[in-house]
């Protein structure tokens, strides 16, 4: 049990996919203008990443490896992720149409979120078993959601701040993301 808790902490804080591995920057920058949309996107990504990790493991170990078709991993994982995203999109549309409208184009873009594909491929490269794959996917999504919500809160505060004209918009957002990355470096060495 300790191994799984350390895997979650390590994936969410120390090896954060956005701030350390620079995966998932498109939704990180695009959806982080309001906390409400950031929370919704974080929850949707959390569900997709966890389920996609499970499905990718099952497809890899029960279809690709027995058929000796591991060269198709990337393509098959993208298809698996697309199916999971479509399922998530339909579920959000039925349960919360307001959130569905707020997320707009970013919900289908989870399919092309490189963090989701990166987690699936890293699970294979790190030789995780089924439980470790799901926990790794959950930890990565937890870290993504945490950083997304924190960044959205900072960006909401930046709207009211007196920022020079040349730094408004993407410039100050990237500077803020860099400072967040430096802050998360403080977690290095937390888990050995």
UniProtKB/Swiss-Prot annotation:
Pfam families membership: Rnf-Nqr
InterPro entries: Ion_transpt_RnfA/RsxA (IPR011293), NqrDE/RnfAE (IPR003667), NqrDE/RnfAE_oxidrdctase (IPR050133)
Keyword DNA-binding carried by entry: no
A single Gene Ontology CC term: plasma membrane
Biological function: Part of a membrane-bound complex that couples electron transfer with translocation of ions across the membrane.
Homology family: Belongs to the NqrDE/RnfAE family.
PANTHER family the UniProt entry points to: INTEGRAL MEMBRANE PROTEIN OF SOXR-REDUCING COMPLEX (PTHR30335), ION-TRANSLOCATING OXIDOREDUCTASE COMPLEX SUBUNIT A (PTHR30335:SF0)
Name the record gives this protein: Ion-translocating oxidoreductase complex subunit A
Organism listed in the record: Haemophilus influenzae (strain ATCC 51907 / DSM 11121 / KW20 / Rd)
